[in-house]
Amino acid sequence: DSMCLLDLLDRWCRERDGRVVAAHFNHQLRGAEADRDETFVRDWCAAHDIAFVSSSGDVRGLMEREGLSLEEAARRLRYDFLRQEAEKLGQHIKIYTAHHADDNAETILFNLIRGTGVAGLTGMAYQQNGICRPLLDVTREELAAYAAARHIPHVEDTTNADPGAAARNFLRLEVMPRLRQINPRAVE
C-alpha cells in the first residue's frame, strides 16, 4: 500500500517540479524483519532518487509507561516522528499515508465494536490535522493491481497474517471476509 502511494506521489511531484520525501518509522517490534523492511524502502528510494528519512522508537516502553495498547503506542510514536519530519521541511508540508478503503472499513467496524457510537461511523478523514489519506476510495485489491501493473515491489509484515497479533488483524483476516460473503461490496 505504502509503496503504491510512494510511486503515485513521486510521479505526481515530478510532473510539477516538486519532491516527495519518504519517511519510515521502525517500531523495533519485529527484529531483523523490521530492519529488512527499512533497508528495502531505503534502497528503493535510493534507486528512484527519492529522499528518505527514518527513525525508530521504543514502542513497548511507551506502552508500559503510559498504559497504552501496542497499536496505540506504535501509532503515537510513528505520527510524532512524521510530524517532526514535516516541521523540518516547512510550514506547508503535508503527511500522506496509504490508508485505503479496506483500512477504513476495518476502522469503522473497530470503532463500532469499541462503542464509539455515531461518531465512529465516519471512519478516517481524507484530510485531518495535516494528515492526508488520498487512497481511502481505493481498495486493497485495486492497489495490488496497480502495483502489479507498475512492477512495484513490496515486503510483507508477517504479523499481518496472524489474526492473534492484533485486534485489527482479526477483523481483517476473520471478520471482513465473512462480511464480504454477505455483501461483496462491504468495503465500498
Predicted regions and their residues:
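An accessory alpha-helical subdomain
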Residues: 179-188
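Core alpha/beta nucleotide-donor-binding catalytic domains of modification enzymes
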Residues: 1-177
